């Protein structure tokens, strides 16, 4: 979903950047507050940022949509550090990719953050916690977080392209066309990301349950480690 420089009209670039900015400001405030409470937190957020950067650096071109498909990693990030911090790590990952890898653009950064960091993160976070409250185990909830986060990201990207490029035509028709262009690549990638997210959480639960407990993802019984 890395929209290239010049894909969107400048007016829509300004709109998406204005939309993303308050989320980034809130995330920075929350990071400062959380770091004061727990010195472990900021380095862990940095680790997650590196993971999101690496995961989202595996593009599959989608020429008919003017962008590319790839796993995002924001579903897993949102489960571990919350959706607000995921917005921040997404900004860092996307900015580095745009500046040094020509992957995405600077004017389209707000649109990319809105899709991957906002829509993807919050959708995955709420899907995970809704599944857990409904009685789903960690694997199932993690799978749903990964899948819904990934697909929400690309649905929002399709919306951004439809709004920016439909011109006098139908936004709905443009959205449908772009969304369908993503299906051959993003349907399997979304399922793969669900498995990856579930597997990562299961691995942490088996090897480092203290991390999940510290991040309030799961609660250990008193005396457990």
UniProtKB/Swiss-Prot annotation:
GO cellular component, as recorded: ATP-binding cassette (ABC) transporter complex
Membrane topology: Multi-pass membrane protein
Keywords, alphabetical: Cell inner membrane, Cell membrane, Cobalamin biosynthesis, Cobalt, Cobalt transport, Ion transport, Membrane, Transmembrane, Transmembrane helix, Transport
Involved pathway(s): Cofactor biosynthesis; adenosylcobalamin biosynthesis
Subcellular location as annotated: Cell inner membrane
Major localization class: membrane
InterPro entries in the cross-refs: CbiM (IPR018024), CbiM/NikMN (IPR002751)
GO terms assigned for molecular function: cobalt ion transmembrane transporter activity
Spans traversing the lipid bilayer: 7-27, 43-63, 76-96, 108-128, 143-163, 175-195
Superkingdom classification of source: Bacteria
The keyword Magnesium belongs to this UniProt entry's keyword annotation: no
Function, in words: Part of the energy-coupling factor (ECF) transporter complex CbiMNOQ involved in cobalt import.
Subunit structure comment from the entry: Forms an energy-coupling factor (ECF) transporter complex composed of an ATP-binding protein (A component, CbiO), a transmembrane protein (T component, CbiQ) and 2 possible substrate-capture proteins (S components, CbiM and CbiN) of unknown stoichimetry.
Family in the record: Belongs to the CbiM family.
Name this polypeptide is given: Cobalt transport protein CbiM
Species this chain originates from: Sorangium cellulosum (strain So ce56) (Polyangium cellulosum (strain So ce56))
Lineage, uppermost ranks: Bacteria, Pseudomonadati, Myxococcota, Polyangia, Polyangiales
């Amino acid at each position: 979903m890395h929209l290239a420089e010049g894909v969107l009209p400048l007016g829509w670039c300004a709109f998406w950047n204005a939309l993303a900015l308050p989320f980034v400001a809130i995330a920075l405030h929350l990071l400062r507050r959380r770091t004061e409470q727990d010195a472990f937190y900021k380095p862990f957020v940095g680790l997650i940022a590196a993971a999101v950067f690496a995961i989202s650096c595996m593009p599959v071109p989608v020429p008919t949509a003017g962008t590319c498909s790839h796993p995002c990693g924001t579903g897993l990030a949102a489960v571990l550090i919350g959706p607000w911090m995921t917005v921040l790590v997404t900004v860092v990952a996307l900015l580095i990719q745009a500046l040094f890898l020509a992957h995405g653009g600077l004017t389209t950064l707000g649109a990319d953050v809105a899709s991957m960091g906002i829509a993807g993160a919050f959708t995955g976070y709420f899907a995970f916690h809704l599944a857990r409250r409904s009685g789903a185990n960690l694997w199932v909830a993690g799978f749903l977080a990964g899948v819904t986060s990934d697909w929400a990201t690309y649905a929002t990207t399709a919306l951004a392209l439809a709004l920016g490029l439909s011109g006098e035509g139908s936004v709905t028709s443009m959205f449908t066309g772009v969304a369908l262009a993503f299906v051959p690549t993003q349907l399997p990638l979304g399922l793969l990301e669900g498995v990856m997210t579930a597997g990562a959480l299961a691995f942490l639960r088996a090897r480092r349950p203290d991390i999940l407990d510290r991040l309030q993802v799961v609660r250990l019984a008193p005396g457990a480690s």
